[in-house]
């Protein structure tokens, strides 16, 4: 099971944490895990290369933590578009595969 936690503060996504593996198929053939991994790495790359945002990304086997610490208004808005796009994509995958993904969204 992949657990994904998204923390939203003041309508901006500040933290995304992913842990676990989908285990929907054998290693190398797990399309759900591959999809989530691809979305996650694409998000990190887009936040740093497109939004030029100040982020902290901790990536290891079966675990990823992304913290968006951007204060600049324009970069913050770009970051928010990217992170909310990620959230919508993950929601879609979770709806189709609830036995492999659990998404928790916390809003303050």
Features from the language model and the residues they span:
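Short, conserved glycine- and acidic-residue-centered signature motifs
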Residues: 32-36
């Amino acid at each position: 099971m992949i657990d994904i936690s998204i923390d939203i503060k003041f309508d901006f996504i500040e933290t995304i944490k992913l842990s676990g593996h989908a285990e929907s198929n054998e290693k190398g053939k797990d399309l759900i895990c591959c999809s989530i991994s691809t979305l996650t790495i694409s998000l990190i790359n887009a936040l740093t290369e497109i939004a030029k945002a100040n982020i902290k990304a901790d990536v290891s086997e079966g675990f990823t933590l992304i913290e968006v610490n951007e204060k600049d208004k324009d970069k913050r808005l770009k970051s928010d578009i990217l992170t909310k796009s990620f959230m919508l994509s993950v929601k879609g995958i979770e709806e189709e595969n609830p036995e492999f993904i659990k998404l928790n969204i916390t809003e303050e």
